[in-house]
Amino acid sequence: MRFTHPVNTLKKLGCGLAFGAAAIMAMPTSALACTQIYMGSKLTADGNTYYGRAEDFSPRYIKHFGIEPAHKDGSEYSSLESGFEYKSKGATYRYTFVRDNPSQWEDRYDAYSEAGINEKGVSCSATLSTSYNEKAEEADPITEETGIGEYNYASVILGESATAREGVELLGSLVDEQGICTNDQVIIADNNETWLFAGLSGHQWIAMKLTDDIASVNPNIGNLNYKVNLDDTENCLHSKDIQTMPEEKGFAKYFEDGQFDVAQTYGEEISDKAMHSWSRYIQGRDYFMAPLAEGTDYEIVKDEREDARATTGALVHEMQPLFFQPG
C-alpha cells in the first residue's frame, strides 16, 4: 500500500526535515518566505508520496503541536486576519495540527493550523503565499471583509472533509461564496489522491490532482508554468469564471497553441522583487536533480535595497515550470 506523507519542514522550529530543508539551505532566505515541495510516489525510494513546506517567518516564532477533538455538534470558524465566518453543517472530524502559539493571536488557540491529518486520513499543508498581477487585482480583488485565508484553511479542511476531493470542493465553494483574503496555495491529500489548490484572485481558484511521476518546488511564485485541461473534472476543479472573467476584462493569456494559460493570466511577471524566490527555486531544482544552468537559464543579481536581508538573488531568463521530472 502506498501512503501520502505531509512533511511540514518548519525552519522556525529548527526541525527542517530532509526535503524542504535541503532544498533551501544553500542560499539565504528572506523573512515571510515559504518553499513548497511535492514528490510523487514513482520518484521515491519507498514508493510513497511526500509533500510539505518550509516556513521562514522569523528566527524565533513559537509553534505548537496538538490535537483538535471531534465536535459532534459541529464547529464555528472565524478569523483574526479577515471577517471570515463559517459554521459546520454537521459533526467535525478529529485532527492533528501545528499552530501558531495563542500569544501571537490575542490568546486564540485556533490560528494557522498549517499542517495536520484527520481521522479519515485527509492531510493538509497550508500555505504557500503567492501574488497576482495588477490586472487580476483590478478585476477581482481579494476580499478581506469575508474571505478565507491561512488562519483557517487547514482547520476547515481537516475538520470537515472525509476525502481530499471533499476538502478541495469545500474550499472552492467557500472561495466562490466568500472569496479569499490572501493569494495562497494549499496541498490537500489522502491515500488515493493529492491535490494542489491555488487561490488566483478574490473569487477565482483552481485545483489540480497531482500525478505520481512529477516533482515540484515553489518558493512563493504564483506564475510558474503549467498546462491543465479545465474540462477534465476528474483531475481539475476550478471556479466557474476562471477563464471567462479575464477574457471579458481583457487580460487573459494563452499558450502558443491557443490553450488558456492560467498561471500567466493571474500571476505576476518576472521581476527583481522575486529575486530571492528564484534563488530558492534554482536551489530546489538542483537538489531534485533537474538543475538550471547559470548564464543560460538564470543570472545571479545583487539586492541593493537598504533593507535587504540577503545581498544576492537570482533572476531567470524565462518563466519556469511548476512541475518537472528529476534527472
What feature does the model see in each segment?
Residues 15, 22-31:
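C-terminal segment of classical bacterial N-terminal signal peptides
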Residues 154-160:
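Short, well-ordered beta-strand elements within core beta-sheets of diverse protein domains
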Residues 2-17:
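Bacterial N-terminal signal peptides that target proteins for export
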Residues 34-150, 170-312, 318-321:
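A contiguous strand-loop segment
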